[in-house]
Amino acid sequence: MFNVRYPNDSFDRYWQPFLDNKHAVSSTQNVTSADFWNLPPPDVFNTAFVAEQDAPLVLQWPPVALQNDSYYVSLYFADTLPDNSRTCDVYINDYLFFKDLNVTSAGLSVFATQWILSGLTTIILKPASPSALPPLINAGKVFALFPVGRLTYARDGIAVATLIASYHFLSVEISWQM
């Protein structure tokens, strides 16, 4: 278990491992992250956090208290065993997030674009019938959009684009990610 960032994550998201070796299980499954709409790095599927048999998996995650706001929440799952599946119900702060989630070795994600969170967040994965295997999770992502202050006016954007175009002969590459 290690931190994942750029270049392993092309969007330079920061993926931090959940520090609990008791429930961590390595996986040799090849999950194709290109099959996911938001392209998680393949490395996040190398380890799963697995519950005890017939018990729910309870996580306090993220590890910090969140401000009361509307968040995007994405959770990622891939069975660690080939040709297997397990079914669970996913709760966030005691509210049902997803019912009868069928996790296979191919992997899947579930997400919400507007989920209200505040303070410490608890994720609970409860085994669901007819699953004989305990629930697991590989990764999660929570983020919020926030205002960045003054907006750029269209005329300013046009002026910058014109200025950049006028210096094109210099072959200067400009990066907006500084």
Residue locations for each model-derived region?
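Compositionally biased, intrinsically disordered or flexible polar/acidic segments
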Residues: 1-178
